[in-house]
Amino acid sequence: MSEIFNALPGIEVEVGAIAKSLAHMWEATAASGRAAPASNDVRATQANVVLHLGFNTTPADALEQFQTMLRFSQRYPSRVVVLCPLKEEHGATEMRAKIYGECFLGRSKGDTRCVEFVMLSYPIAARQRLEDQVSICLSTDLPLYYWVHRFLTTQRMADYTYLLSRAKRVLIDSATAPADTLAYPWPNPAALRDLVYSRLLPVRQTVGQFLAGYSPEILVDGLKAVTVRHGGELAAEARVTLGWLQRRLAACGATVQDIAFADETDGNGKFEIHFAYGTAGKFFHWAGDLTTRHAMFEADFGSGPATLPAPVSLLAPEWALSEAMFF
């Protein structure tokens, strides 16, 4: 993981001088005429985010998540601590630190939104000291959000209980997380948020709004099967969508044990939802193309066929983050 730490932007500083180095960085930024947070501007930072890069992270992926946090912070100013663990065979015994800061000017005068990054590279042997160092880097009066990214295994999660327990939200991405992630005994399950579910918000909204035009009784009467078809790259999105449909249909009064729920891999590049009924001619079908961002509804619930074109997309990564954190 030293290659990840080395690939991330920033200025390397002494671990024991992070706060002083951040202050000097902003002083130099302001002196050069660039945007910097005012010392009394409480709006300049609004959240603590710990981005924990697991051993499945590549340097390119780490940079992508760094850029996601930069875009996120243009709307939600943040202090971000990026954790870069080192494998035991690396041989390092000490932590290393980098800092990075950037401010964005808002629409009104005095609306400055800033992000501060502290990157910490640490060997597993130094993990016991990590808690104190992370605590020093965070703003004590702001909420903490813990983003667990591409861990190789959940076995190490117990080593970070202090973050899991303190965080207002714990963020995972079940598309890239270990297979047993959702079954892990999280200290605070209510805080867990899946970024797959979050980025599906536009799909959930458009499908939900269409189906809301019919009574729950009509939707569930005679329902025999619910199928989600998808390309292989959308397997996680299909699984999460199927679970969402099952919960919503149960809320409509369906006996879900009597309905066949399935997801099928399809090579046509579309993301599709199909309801099959025991009544001849009754059906619901939605097909979305995430490349062209076009979708089509087709349905007949007994009152005649209906078709409706609609837009479709997944949330951008920074918007999925905000959805998972705050909603």
Regions found by a protein language model. Give the residues of each.
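Short, solvent-exposed amphipathic alpha-helical segments in soluble enzyme
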Residues: T68-R71, V134-I136, T161-L164, L242-Q246
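Short, surface-exposed beta-strand/loop "edge" segments at domain boundaries and coil↔beta transitions
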Residues: T57-A60, L234-A236, G278-A287
